[in-house]
């Protein structure tokens, strides 16, 4: 609550639609947020996404988007709200005015070896998402090599600490990567069944 109250909150109650965000705990090759936001918006769901930069070895959603020339993720709250109202989806980077306490802690986690601290992860995720004024949240907890949650038990612990009542699908991050690579190679005729 202290991190939420350290800055402004956003009010989307004037929208005539369900307001949801998607957050990932991060992992190598994670691009789900970039794809899922527009899909949900096409279904009439308003999707304000307050996304993060890299922590540790993974690139954050904002880092990926900023590789596109001219793509602006540094928006005012008013511009953010206008974009969501106009197009149904908007992704912006964390600002000085939304959860500034979290922004400072987030930067410190990267240099203090506390990136994988589950209580700090919970506080960081939920303070930003509550500040967005959303009705629902899709939380993508990545597990396995290349993710912050190395094991299924760590992923479950994070979900439990977030007090999520969820429908859960567990799949290790390296499994989907292997399946994708195998499928591509099979199409090229490089792997036989």
Predicted regions and their residues:
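Flexible, glycine/charged-enriched surface loops at secondary-structure junctions
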Residues: 9, 13, 137, 168-179
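Glycine/serine-rich anion-binding loops at beta->alpha junctions
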Residues: 18-57
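General beta-strand structural signal in soluble alpha/beta enzymes
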Residues: 21, 47-51, 73-76, 91-94, ...
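A glycine-rich helix N-cap at a beta->alpha junction
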Residues: 64-90, 161-169
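Divalent-metal (Mg2+/Mn2+/Ca2+)-assisted nucleotide/phosphate chemistry catalytic cores
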Residues: 69, 81-157
């Amino acid at each position: 609550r202290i991190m939420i109250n350290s800055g402004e909150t956003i009010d989307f109650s004037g929208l005539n639609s369900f307001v949801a965000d998607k957050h990932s705990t991060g992992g190598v090759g994670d691009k789900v947020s970039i794809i899922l936001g527009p899909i949900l918006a096409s279904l009439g769901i308003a999707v304000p996404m307050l996304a993060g930069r890299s922590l540790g070895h993974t690139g954050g959603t904002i880092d990926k988007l900023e590789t596109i020339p001219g793509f602006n993720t540094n928006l005012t709250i008013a511009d953010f709200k206008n974009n969501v109202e106009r197009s149904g989806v908007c992704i912006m980077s964390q600002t000085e005015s939304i959860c500034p306490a979290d922004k400072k802690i987030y930067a410190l986690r990267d240099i203090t070896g506390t990136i994988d601290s589950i209580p700090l992860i919970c506080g960081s995720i939920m303070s930003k998402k509550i500040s967005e004024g959303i009705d629902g949240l899709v939380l993508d907890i990545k597990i396995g090599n290349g993710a912050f949650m190395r094991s299924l038990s760590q992923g479950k612990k994070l979900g439990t600490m977030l007090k999520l009542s969820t429908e859960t699908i567990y799949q290790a991050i390296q499994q989907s990567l292997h399946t994708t690579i195998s499928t591509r190679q099979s199409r090229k005729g490089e792997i036989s069944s």
